[in-house]
Amino acid sequence: MAILLHFGVLITAFLSSHVEGKRDPILYCGACRALVDELLYEIRKVNPKKTVDVGSFRISPDGKQEQNKVPFAKSELYLTDVLEEICEKMNDYGLYVDPTTQEKSYKRFAPRDNEGIGSVDFKNFQFNPEESNSLKYACERVVEEHEDEVLSVITKENDNLADKLCTEETGLCKEYLHNEL
């Protein structure tokens, strides 16, 4: 009897570790796109002339060090630091319902440092504190599960970063495609 109980507990633990709830495609796609939007904003704030040495700090047999200079804003060092805090900015996003198509997406409603508040159409946003927390959680999951892809795309690519990361690399927007944030 005790063996059956242990076996039942093991099977339940095994199955529960492999079963994941269905992710809301709008939420996770929105979190990924908002993540890219915030990363690009942070990158634009850094002086483009600022560089950092990357590469091996080992000395080759001929006495030379293999190092390269890369823009600081696109360095793994800087991006990793930014990623640690980026999901806190998800509170500045809300669920937006397009008045024409009724398509839902997450858009930024809070103005940044130099932006005015006049360009935001608040009547089509659905403000809900639980949605904000869900978006932050989804962002944290995206960073946790896809950090390597995020760093790779941001450091190597220049165009269509949201599409490249969120659709091609992670597949988070395959079910739910957007044109803009």
From Swiss-Prot:
Residues 25-177 form the Saposin B-type domain. Keywords: Developmental protein, Disulfide bond, Endoplasmic reticulum, Signal. This is Protein canopy homolog 1. It is found in: Endoplasmic reticulum. Its main location: endoplasmic reticulum. It comes from Xenopus laevis (African clawed frog). Plays an role in early embryonic development. A motif (Prevents secretion from ER) lies at residues 178-181. PANTHER family: CANOPY FGF SIGNALING REGULATOR 1, MIR-INTERACTING SAPOSIN-LIKE PROTEIN. InterPro entries: CNPY, DUF3456. PROSITE patterns: ER_TARGET.
